[in-house]
Amino acid sequence: MRSHEIFQRMSPTLAAEIFTFLQTEQKPVYKAAIQGLANQRNLRGVFIERKPPAERFPWMQAAFGRKISDSLASHVLQSWLLGANKQMLCDFLDALEIQHGEDGTVDELPADLPKEKIAAAADRLLGKYPTETVAVYLHAFRDMDSTVQWPALDEVLAEEPRLKL
């Protein structure tokens, strides 16, 4: 699932949580995202920024849900996941026994992993974190590195009803 499709399927509540986090904790990313969306629509960024959050956040979610916004949506998801959800990323990588930095970054992912191991790691996350947040993370993780494809992760995402968006 591409990043723009994740925004199409996530709840407005989670989208608002993401945008609020970026607005308060990752201001440069938030400003760049707004400017990118504004440029796509031939608008000035201030036009978007001046909308009250109750109007701005649904508008942003719809805009990130457009195919043309996929790279912007990917950047926003990565910033939110690495900023607000480092521990979840680290827990997933630990469960898979993958070496990573303190912030959850990985130098090299294995070519493939057994389905049982991925399913157990996903179940561990689902037991500890909000279901929709885990689903967004795993769908985004699957799409982040096009050089590494884990068919077992695809199967887990397709079979586990809690991971559907």
Regions found by a protein language model. Give the residues of each.
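Short terminal alpha-helical segments
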Residues: 1-32, 97
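Short acidic DE-rich linear segments
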Residues: 162-165
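Acidic, low-complexity, intrinsically disordered interaction modules
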Residues: 24-151
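Charge-rich, intrinsically disordered N-terminal extensions
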Residues: 151, 155-159
